[in-house]
Regions:
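Short, well-structured hydrophobic secondary-structure segments
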Residues: 39-71
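Conserved NAD+-utilizing ADP-ribose enzyme module
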Residues: 1-37, 60-62, 73-81, 87-189
Length: 189
């Protein structure tokens, strides 16, 4: 499948030298600075959950994010490069980017509008104004079934198809030089 990914220019150097690029912990720490621990845990969860759907070697812990549409790809910026890549089906996983936002914020990923409404009513019944507190604080100890319901729903990011295909993204766990079809460098505009 054809994808587009924006990466730091150092990724191109690594691809030229080694023939592949693998996201390393230090890259995430450098990019995200003071909030890197949040992203490291989030991406580690994502990889663990993704292993239910795709074979990912144990030493690969962090995903490379891919746009499924050229129209929706991140645009080039200074010190960044766009790679157009053709990735074998066994090497990528598609997820619902809209639902990924729910996971990022520790929210319940509903099956549909009716399920979302029922969930919101359940939160209201218990007087819970901020559902993320069920996962991020000790409040979840008082509502363990509700907390577990939220956590179990997160795998739906891989199974619920969005109404709008532009809300899909791909991930892979390495880029190989032979997958690169085009490289676009930042031209200053």
């Amino acid at each position: 499948m054809r994808f587009w990914t924006r990466q730091h220019e150092a990724v191109w150097d690594e691809l030229q030298k080694t023939g592949q690029y693998i996201v390393k912990k230090e890259y995430i720490e450098e990019k995200n600075d003071t909030i890197s621990e949040f992203y490291l845990k989030l991406y580690e969860w994502y990889t663990k959950a993704a292993r239910k759907y795709i074979d990912i070697p144990e030493d690969l812990k962090y995903p490379v994010w891919l746009s499924v549409s050229e129209d929706m790809m991140l645009q080039p910026t200074e010190h960044a490069i766009i790679f157009e890549v053709e990735i074998p089906e066994s090497e990528y996983l598609i997820c619902n980017f809209d639902k990924w936002g729910y996971r990022v914020n520790y929210f319940y990923v509903p099956l549909d509008e009716a399920d979302e409404k029922a969930h919101m009513e359940e939160l209201k019944k218990y007087g819970i104004a901020s559902e993320d507190s069920l996962v991020t604080t000790s409040k979840g100890n008082f509502y363990p079934l509700l907390r577990q319901k939220i956590i179990k729903s997160w795998d739906r990011i891989f199974t619920i198809q969005p109404d709008d295909p532009s809300l899909m993204v791909g991930t892979c766990w390495k880029l190989k030089k032979e997958w690169i079809k085009e490289v676009r460098f930042y031209d200053g505009e």
